[in-house]
Swiss-Prot record:
Species in which this protein is naturally found: Shewanella frigidimarina (strain NCIMB 400)
Cross-referenced InterPro entries: P-loop_NTPase (IPR027417), PanK (IPR004566), PRK/URK (IPR006083)
Biological processes annotated in GO: coenzyme A biosynthetic process
EC number: 2.7.1.33
Major subcellular site: cytoplasm
Keywords, comma-separated and alphabetical: ATP-binding, Coenzyme A biosynthesis, Cytoplasm, Kinase, Nucleotide-binding, Transferase
Stated name of the protein: Pantothenate kinase
CDD domains: PanK
Catalytic activity: (R)-pantothenate + ATP = (R)-4'-phosphopantothenate + ADP + H(+)
Biological or metabolic pathway of the protein: Cofactor biosynthesis; coenzyme A biosynthesis; CoA from (R)-pantothenate: step 1/5
Keyword Disulfide bond in annotation: no
Binding site for ATP: G95, S96, V97, A98, V99, G100, K101, S102
């Protein structure tokens, strides 16, 4: 027996797509085809059927969890005889490069903010918490971008802690995929949302992953519900190569792009470079740092070919 499957059987309820879709119950589809087009990621053939079968049941589940936390807050208010400030419900979304985390995050944000109980849903990506490009170069970490050490974890934890504490306004740094760098003069203002979705590669990490300093808080300490978007590495590598080819024709063609020199590559050259980037950076980061955190998630979305979800694992 595969030990990974054995662990998952012990920790999770497993649902094939058909059975998971039945858990939607009567939740209405409030997303139009036009809206879906704006939310869809590069190379993803996401359909309204996928939203109906996978994301509507998930939004129903999350709505129930958020409601449970809100009720708990009322209990605390009554016990303390004062208004407690529980802060927003925080959902983290982890997974490999090219797996479709951003699309999952955007769809959930759109669906969750249409529930009347929690209309204000903000989405923050951890890309903005990468060290600035100059710092990465100075530290010799440019080829380790995306690895845990390339993030300003102190800054990220301070941000998520302030959000959880209910601070009125917190500024999150933004990231430019054109300049491949943090935006130094642009920020995203977070003002006491009902729900915060935090999307990034390493948001499931704990002190177990950094034994040198196990006492400091981690992002996962502040998260109420965690999601891991999963797929076989062979699929992930192929999706990454496809995305690289799309970027070559699109974002890389911008003269201001950090990767503008890739825009003149032939298809064969682009495929070779993308495969090498995967084999030397993204693949090792997946196997060493990202995939080992998978079984910490409250829910695992497993993708098959064409980015279609075929299995959902819900922690018992």
């Amino acid at each position: 027996m595969n030990p990974i499957n054995s662990i998952q059987d012990a920790l999770y309820f497993a649902f094939q797509r058909k059975h998971w879709a039945e858990l939607r119950k009567s939740v209405p589809l409030t997303l139009s085809q036009a809206e879906l087009e704006n939310l869809r990621g590069m190379n993803e053939k996401l359909s309204l059927d996928e939203v109906t079968d996978i994301y509507l049941p998930l939004s129903r589940l999350l709505n129930l969890f958020v409601g449970s936390k809100q009720q708990r807050g009322l209990v605390l208010d009554k016990f303390l005889e004062q208004k407690a400030s529980p802060g927003p419900y925080i959902i983290s979304i982890a997974g490999s490069v090219a797996v479709g985390k951003s699309t999952t995050a955007r769809i959930l944000q759109t669906l969750l903010q249409r529930w009347p109980e929690h209309p204000k849903v903000d989405l923050v990506t951890t890309d903005g918490f990468l060290y600035p490009l100059a710092d990465l170069k100075r530290k010799g970490l440019l080829q380790r971008k995306g690895f845990p050490e390339s993030y300003d974890m102190k800054m990220l934890v301070e941000f998520i802690s302030a959000v959880k504490a209910g601070q009125k306004e917190i500024l999150a740094p933004l990231y430019s995929h054109v300049t491949y760098d943090r935006c130094h003069d642009e920020h995203q203002a977070i003002r006491q949302p009902d729900i915060l979705i935090l999307e990034g590669l390493n948001v499931l990490q704990t002190g177990l992953d950094t034994p040198i300093d196990t006492r400091r808080p981690f992002v996962s300490d502040f998260v109420d519900f965690s999601i891991y978007v999963d797929a076989d590495e062979s699929l992930l590598k192929e999706w990454y190569k496809q995305r690289f080819l799309q970027f070559r024709k699109g974002a890389f063609s911008d003269p201001n792009s950090f990767f503008h020199h890739y825009s003149c590559l032939t298809d064969d050259e682009a495929n070779t470079i993308a495969a090498n980037i995967w084999d030397t950076i993204n693949g090792p980061n997946l196997s060493l740092n990202i995939q080992p955190t998978r079984e910490r998630a409250n829910l695992i979305l497993q993708k098959g070919p064409n980015h279609l979800m075929d299995r959902v694992l819900l922690r018992k």
